[in-house]
Amino acid sequence: MSSLRFRVVEKAFQTKAREFSIPEERPSEYFGKYVFNREKMFKYLPGDVFAKLVDVIDNGAALDSGIADEVASGMKRWAMELGATHYTHWFQPLTEGTAEKHDAFVEHNGKGGMMEEFSGKLLVQQEPDASSFPNGGIRNTFEARGYSAWDPSSPVFVVDDTLCIPTIFISYTGESLDYKTPLLKALRAMNKAAVDVCHYFDPSVKKVFSYLGWEQEYFLVDEGLYAARPDLLLTGRTLMGHEASKNQQLEDHYFGAIPIRVAAFMKDLEIQALELGIPVKTRHNEVAPNQFELAPIYEECNLAVDHNMLIMSLMRKVARAHGFRVLLHEKPFKGINGSGKHNNWSLGTDNGIALMAPGKTAEENLRFITFIVNTLMAVYRHNGLLKASIMSATNAHRLGANEAPPAIISSFLGTQLSQVLDHLEVSTDEDMGVLVGKHGMKLDIPQIPELLIDNTDRNRTSPFAFTGNRFEFRAVGSEANCASAMIALNTAMAEQLTDFKRDVDEAMSDDVSKETAILQVLRRYIKTCKPIRFDGNGYSEEWKAEAARRGLDCETSCPVIFDNYLSESSVRMFTSTGVMTKVELEARNEVKWETYTKKIQIEARVLGDLAMNHIVPVATHYQSMLINNVYRLKELFDASEAEGMSAENISLIREIAERTAYIKKHVDDMVEARKVANRIDNVREKAIAYHDTIAPMLEQIRYHIDKLELIVDDQMWTLPKYRELLFIR
């Protein structure tokens, strides 16, 4: 096995950048080549059908079943011209991946031959087996039917030879079994509530969009090195491995020159992403060695989520073509930065108003502050739920590790905006009236300047930071489906804006103007949500103590954090907005607990196997060599001289014996602990047992394996080391 390590290292050093075809057209010309966008709709659909479909997409009108066949026919013609032979309903089950079943267009023509057929019924609805996906007990094998249904708001696209149709996925009884269904409901609820609030300032607003711009971090590892690490292959992260002498301490990788092989991968990925309509914009080296980032231009939230799921799939495919494996795990390597996926979230209206951006008039700035303060209220009221929405067995390794935001949700506003809110908090009604009437002179600034975008500092320790015209939800994990965080955030915002509208309407009277009522409510909210505002160092121990005093959720146990989904406030929020029922929430939590347990269980099995079948045999083999050396020294030299010569080897022999004995014992203990945990019927209690008992054992065993790596002869060590995984590019 050690020879495999050196063979793959040698091959990785010799691998050259892969050549690939680059389109002759400009990116703007081949953008969306494989997407059935409006340009294609106009070309392939009758005029009246095109108009009705656009109405469905833009205004949420009900899909007229009478046009489904014509839409399907147009899609089929377009897709077949691109070489498509199959179609699939492309959906996002609760696996945090995507699912698809490919069916061919061909059907019997009734004359002994075949023809291509794709009907409106096949476009609009399919029936996957719901019991074979995570469902939290909603579906059983004997009641397996589920439905996938077309989402017209996300355009269909062609990948290879398959027409992919974005769909929702629900059970036979109507419960959602995916991420898209509650996301669409959350966006609808947020839109309704936000439009009502916008009408205080602009009655012409008809729709409010939630926008998302994600930043996808990832690692690239040579495919041969990856294959020689069973832990990477099976769990997505290294379960053992001592830190390399050099990692990221020189701070020379961030924004550094992109390695040639990596640059070829990035360029190929970008071309294919642009052809699929994903507006990729940025690429660069990240902080850790062999860590990189990809980011697009922001898009409407539902489409942005679909594009992120598509890009992660595309990254895996393109990476293999270039001799890499892409690692999307939040913490694939110990001792260096993990990977996140910052979610840049904002709201905007159909007439072009950016609700999270300051304006030029007092009224525009009052609107701006209204949405900022309501966002803070939503985050404060549901800080535990927002943490649960981004928590997982994998992301838990990254959060709070002095490289990523802490596992305590707080919001950074920056000095300038904080001063504005602090002033409003202590203002009188008369002061606030002057604010509206005289362009904010009472705030000691004539207006909140557009340059606020540049005047807002960056606090990298904040999990939910205002960055000038949007909030950046930094706690989201690199492997996660963004929909989870966006469902929680947009639903919380919908509930909060609804409550704000009620409070303002109640405050308005003959003697209280609309503007004064708004400011009175905002002042009360600013006081209420003040605990969520924190501009200091989120990594500090002092903040943890302060956050607890403020009443923020400071829980760190992943399975316990999931309880937030079933809290009274969360259930009320999701049910009152129509986003999810209590049954759906209970099912999702069961899936979360089961997934957590299974991931720790897999890691424990893999580590136990590697420890007993790779590490211990190699260590004892090296120990035998040392023992033989000691005996030979005693044969060649007198006792006192041999004792001095062999002292170091005897010390190593003893240390190897102690560490291998510890590893064996703790692997046995871990097996027994799993047996005990597996007998627990309650899924929550089982997940807690795995968190409290088995997860710590992984680190204990790893500690001794990593110490052995420093002792055992490098030529005998079978697994690629960190210096090889991270610095061969």
Where in the sequence are the language-model features?
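Short linear, low-complexity motifs centered on an aromatic residue
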Residues: 96-113, 130-131, 229, 236-238, ...
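Histidine/acidic residue-rich metal-binding segments in metalloenzymes
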Residues: 13-119, 124-140
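Active-site-proximal loop/turn and secondary-structure-junction residues that shape catalytic pockets
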Residues: 67-71, 91-93, 121-122, 169, ...
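Hydrophobic/aromatic-rich, well-ordered segments within soluble, folded domains that form packed cores
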Residues: 84, 88-91, 307-320, 347, ...
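N-terminal hydrophobic targeting/anchoring segments and the immediately downstream early-domain regions
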Residues: 1-24, 141-157, 162
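Active-site proximal loops enriched in glycine and acidic residues that flank catalytic Cys/His/Asp
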Residues: 67, 91, 119, 296-298, ...
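Glycine-rich, acidic/polar active-site loops that bind/position phosphate-bearing ligands
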Residues: 143-328, 337-340, 347-590
